[in-house]
Regions:
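C-terminal helical subdomain
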Residues: 188, 200-238
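Conserved glycine-rich cofactor-binding loop
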Residues: 14-15
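Conserved NAD(P)H cofactor-binding loop of Rossmann-fold oxidoreductase domains
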Residues: 85-91
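Residue(s) in the substrate-gating loop at a strand-loop-helix junction
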Residues: 146
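Active-site helix of classical SDR
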Residues: 115, 162
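Short alpha-helical oligomerization interface
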Residues: 92-105
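Rossmann-fold cofactor-recognition segment
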Residues: 49-64
C-alpha cells in the first residue's frame, strides 16, 4: 500500500451498482474498502479482488454505522472517496406503509447518517491540510440517487421522494463545503432504471446494465462531475419530462 494509491470506501458493495463500482475502482488502481450487510459477500469480494483490501459489515440504519465507517477508514489507511450506494425501494401501488417507512429509514436516515459521517471526516482532514504545506486533491463524496428523484413516481412514492431528498441534500452539502472553504467535491449520480434486485420483476423501460453504469459512474467521479445522469437517453427523458406540467404529470400512467 503506497501513498500514490487513492483510497475509496464503497457502501452497499455487496450487490448491484455498488459491487460493480468497487470492482472497477480496484481494477483502476484504487485501494478499496467495502461495506454492506452481508459479510459472506464482502469477504468473497475481498478475497477475489486484489485492490479490495478490507471490508466491514455496516447497516446504514444502525446508530453504530458511523463508528464502523471510521473503523473501515482506519483499516484502509485513509479515504479520498466516499461512495454511497446503499438503498432500497419497492413498487408500492397499494401503499404498504411498512415498505414506505423502511425506504425512508434507509434512503433518508441511513443516507444522512453515512454521508454526514464522511463529510465531517473530510472536513476535519481538509482543515488540517490548510495548516500544512502539503496539498491534497479534492476529497470526494459520490452518491447514487436516481432519475426517480426528478419527478414524483406514483408507483414508488417513498423511493421517488427519498431520491429527491438525497439530491437536494447533496446540493446543500456542496454549498456548505464552499461556504466553509473545504476541499470537498460532491457528485450526484442519477442513473436510469438499472437491472438490479431493486427493480426485479418491474416493467420499467430502458433498463441499463449495472456494469455499464459503473463505468459511467467511475468516469464521472474521476472527472469531478457535480451531477451525472446515466445514460444519454435518460438525460433526454429527464429534460423532456421536466417540461410536463404537474396537472398533466399526475394524470399519466408511469409504471405498474
Amino acid at each position: 500500500m503506497t501513498q500514490s494509491h487513492r483510497k475509496a470506501i464503497v457502501t452497499g458493495a455487496t450487490s448491484g451498482i455498488g459491487k460493480e463500482v468497487a470492482k472497477l475502482l480496484a481494477e483502476r488502481g484504487w485501494l478499496v474498502g467495502i461495506a454492506g450487510r452481508r459479510v459472506d459477500r464482502l469477504e468473497a469480494m475481498r478475497q477475489s479482488h486484489e485492490g479490495i483490501v478490507c471490508c466491514q459489515q455496516i447497516d446504514v440504519t444502525s446508530p453504530d454505522a458511523p463508528s464502523r465507517l471510521l473503523t473501515l477508514i482506519g483499516q484502509l489507511g485513509g479515504m479520498d472517496l466516499y461512495f454511497h450506494s446503499s438503498g432500497i425501494g419497492w413498487q408500492n401501488n397499494l401503499l404498504d406503509v411498512e415498505k414506505e417507512l423502511k425506504t425512508v429509514e434507509t434512503n433518508g436516515l441511513g443516507f444522512v447518517r453515512m454521508v454526514d459521517a464522511a463529510f465531517n471526516w473530510f472536513a476535519e482532514k481538509s482543515s488540517e491540510n490548510k495548516d500544512s504545506t502539503a496539498s491534497h486533491p479534492s476529497y470526494q463524496i459520490a452518491c447514487i440517487t436516481s432519475i426517480a428523484g426528478t419527478k414524483g413516481l406514483g408507483a414508488a412514492p417513498s423511493y421517488s421522494s427519498t431520491k429527491r431528498f438525497q439530491s437536494h441534500y447533496l446540493e446543500c452539502l456542496t454549498q456548505q463545503a464552499r461556504m466553509r472553504h473545504l476541499n470537498i467535491s460532491i457528485t450526484d449520480i442519477r442513473p436510469g432504471f438499472v437491472k438490479t434486485d431493486l427493480i426485479a420483476g418491474s416493467n420499467y423501460p430502458l433498463q441499463l446494465d449495472a456494469k455499464d453504469v459503473a463505468k459511467s459512474i467511475v468516469r464521472a467521479v474521476e472527472k469531478g462531475k457535480s451531477v451525472k445522469v446515466i445514460d444519454w437517453r435518460y438525460a433526454l427523458l429527464v429534460f423532456l419530462w421536466s417540461l410536463i406540467p404537474r396537472w398533466v404529470w399526475t394524470r399519466m400512467m408511469i409504471a405498474k
